[in-house]
Regions:
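Topogenic membrane-insertion module of multi-pass membrane proteins
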Residues: 46-97, 101, 196, 200, ...
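PAS/PAC sensory module
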Residues: 2-4, 9-18, 23, 33
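PAS-family sensory domains
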Residues: 27-39
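Extended hydrophobic alpha-helices typical of membrane-associated regions
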Residues: 296-313
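Solvent-exposed interhelical
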Residues: 112-156, 242-285
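Membrane-embedded alpha-helical segments that form the functional core of polytopic membrane enzymes
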Residues: 87-112, 179-187, 231-250
Length: 313
């Protein structure tokens, strides 16, 4: 098998790897022995295994944590739904632009968080991470999928593109959409970046997640459709914000040890795992209580109560 390796001088060199089975004195197979020999007539690029397009696609899905963009889609669709409920026409084109801008902002937040968690050492010393990427960051740097500099570049490009895509939204909806986007950018970037490190501020990080992925994003989506800041859209985002905050909150539990060692004072670190368990129940319950209250007081149709069935699952 041919591949490239890093020598003691940190140079990439082309190699041939020979693997042979090893046996004990009685002839039983007990393992394998690998011998690496340098190939002198080829370059590292010629011997490096080819990576398929699907593998590359999956790699970038991991780096940018694309499956978690649902946390952006839900409040944006909710805001558009509220606009429709209030009698405003909904433009699918503007909805698509809003989703694109929000997704770029979310990707920039994900990758910048990975970069600064790497710089602080939080993700590097975290051995309780999940394979699903729910906690411990995307692990893209730790797995060698991309360099720290590469992640920082992806974050910068994503944030820059979100600003460019946001220009037509500002032209259509006015300066209020700029302030909402700017708030989302700053709170996303400085969630783990110094000097603010919002995620280390004993609950401020969790609060900002709930606000951004709940009321503010829903209100911003409705603002693009209507040109108005609708209180109903803000209210519709409250249960969504509680649920997104709950997802982040519960996945801070396995990060407790590494977060504590690096001074990342999340609510789990601040309260301790035992007391913090009640916080998850409170967030989850608050989401469904808020739905019930807004349906009962007439803010939203009584059929909204059907959403309570999701609590069973």
């Amino acid at each position: 098998m041919n591949d490239s390796k890093i020598d003691k001088h940190k140079n990439e060199i082309p190699c041939q790897i020979k693997i042979t089975p090893t046996k004990d004195n009685e002839g039983n197979h007990i393992g394998y022995c690998g011998v690496t020999e340098r190939i002198h007539d080829k370059s590292p690029n010629e011997v490096r295994p080819k990576i398929s397009f699907v593998t590359k696609l999956f790699k970038w899905m991991v780096i940018m944590r694309l499956p978690f963009l649902s946390a952006t889609f839900v409040p944006i669709f909710a805001g558009a739904a509220v606009a429709s409920m209030m009698g405003f026409p909904v433009s699918w084109t503007w909805l698509g632009i809003t989703l694109f801008a929000g997704s770029l902002l979310h990707i920039g937040t994900n990758t910048s968080n990975d970069y600064f968690d790497y710089k602080s050492g939080t993700d590097t010393i975290n051995y309780n991470y999940s394979n699903e990427g729910l906690n411990g960051g995307s692990r893209s740097i730790q797995m060698g999928l991309i360099s720290p500099k590469g992640v920082a570049i992806v974050a910068a490009i994503s944030f820059s593109l979100s600003a460019i895509v946001g220009i037509p939204l500002i032209i259509k909806a006015g300066l209020n959409i700029l302030w909402l986007g700017l708030f989302g950018f700053l709170s996303g970037l400085f969630y783990t970046a110094p000097p603010f490190n919002f995620s280390s501020r004993r609950g401020l990080g969790e609060l900002l997640i709930g606000l951004n992925f709940g009321p503010l994003m829903a209100a911003g989506s409705a603002l693009v459709q209507t040109g108005q800041l609708l209180p109903e859209a803000f209210l519709a985002g409250i249960p969504i914000g509680f649920l997104i905050a709950a997802v982040v909150y519960i996945n801070e539990f396995p990060d407790h040890d590494s977060d504590k060692r690096t001074g990342k004072n999340t609510l789990i670190v601040t309260l301790g795992p035992e007391k913090a368990r009640r916080g998850y129940v409170a967030l989850f319950a608050s989401a469904f209580i808020s739905i019930a209250l807004m349906a009962i007081n007439g803010t939203f149709p009584i059929l909204t109560l059907a959403a309570l069935a999701a609590a069973y699952f």
